[in-house]
Amino acid sequence: MKSVLITGFEPFGGERVNPSWEVVKQLNDFMLGGVKVVARQLPCAFGEALTALNAAIDEIQPVLVLAIGQAGGRADISIERVAINVDDARIADNLGNQPIDQPIVENGPAAYFTRLPIKAMVQGIREAGIPASVSQTAGTYVCNHVMYGLLHRLHQTNDEIKGGFIHIPYLPEQAVNHPGAPSMSAHSVVIALELAISIALQIDHDSHIAGGAIH
């Protein structure tokens, strides 16, 4: 049976929950067209997160890897276009590490583009009435670290696995502690991720529609 690996993070930065894991764990063992979804939690720690991700890939042998992370302040489902080869942590990770201007992979490429049909995914999620967009930056914290490490692995192994990263907003119960911050219900995010998985599995060539940014 084919499998999809979907990951979320443990809480970080003083939050009591991480919406990525709260949502992702609901998809564990979900069946989609004969494909089984397997959920795994990653530590919010440089290095350790990639170790856990690589172990999960080796174990599950998925055809698709979707890494999900929290982006407090964003209002929609943000599907990442690119990961860059730098760790530049504004805050320490959960193990107290705070790399500044360090490459994720020494002598690795400056960036990798996603292996997901991101515009088709955005279009499908929007058609379901859920806000979504293509994001041009995954940041320089553990989320970007995981996305770059994932795509580097897939590039190095010439693997046909599809892979990429999606950022999601705060949950409403988090947003009450961040006045003015947008949020999205876990129910809406689950629907969006189910659609993202389905579209990524079905589509090999992305939609030719605008998804860029002015700034």
From Swiss-Prot:
One of its GO terms (molecular function) is pyroglutamyl-peptidase activity. The active site is at 80, 143, 167. It is an enzyme of class 3 (hydrolase). Keywords: Cytoplasm, Hydrolase, Protease, Thiol protease. Its main location: cytoplasm. InterPro entries: Peptidase_C15, Peptidase_C15-like, Peptidase_C15-like_sf, PGP-I_bact-type, PGPEP1_Cys_AS, PGPEP1_Glu_AS. It is found in: Cytoplasm. Its EC number is 3.4.19.3. It catalyses: Release of an N-terminal pyroglutamyl group from a polypeptide, the second amino acid generally not being Pro. GO terms for cellular component: cytosol. Gene3D superfamilies: Peptidase C15, pyroglutamyl peptidase I-like. Coiled coil: none annotated. One of its GO terms (biological process) is proteolysis. PROSITE patterns: PYRASE_CYS, PYRASE_GLU. The keyword Ribosomal protein does not apply. Removes 5-oxoproline from various penultimate amino acid residues except L-proline. NCBIfam families: PRK13197.1, pyro_pdase. Belongs to the peptidase C15 family. Homotetramer. This is Pyrrolidone-carboxylate peptidase. It comes from Yersinia enterocolitica serotype O:8 / biotype 1B (strain NCTC 13174 / 8081). The lineage of its organism: Bacteria, Pseudomonadati, Pseudomonadota, Gammaproteobacteria, Enterobacterales. The gene is pcp.
